[in-house]
């Protein structure tokens, strides 16, 4: 797993919304590492503009608010098994943090808990955001990066 201090997010401000259950889950751990660290790793892969990628000769688009995250690549980066990655992504999905769409080429991860981000003074709404909790049911986190 990358050192948390080395993670670089694609923008300097994020607005996220999540349930209290998701918030508590992020403060738990998987394989001795805080679950928030894994989510931050996914956030560092999130695109803020459309990106065209190619794997095995097949092209595909990664849209704003999505991350390209094959299970094998994440397993290697995070230092845990592929099944552990799959379970962790499933846990994130069940708590309304992400949505995973897998195909034979890769897994596209929608960062559905990210409401918006700010780049160059512009607020950009996340097209992948899905409101899963009402304001009184969850927590909103504003993450400022410098």
Question: Predicted regions: what is each one?
Answer:
Residues 104-124:
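Short, cationic-aromatic polyanion-contact patches
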Residues 117-138:
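Short, amphipathic alpha-helical interaction segments positioned at domain boundaries
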Residues 43, 47, 79, 116:
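Residue-level marker of positions within ordered structural domains that often coincide
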Residues 1-72:
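Short recognition helix of helix-turn-helix/winged-helix DNA-binding domains
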Residues 143-146:
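Conserved small/polar residues in nucleotide/adenosyl-binding loops
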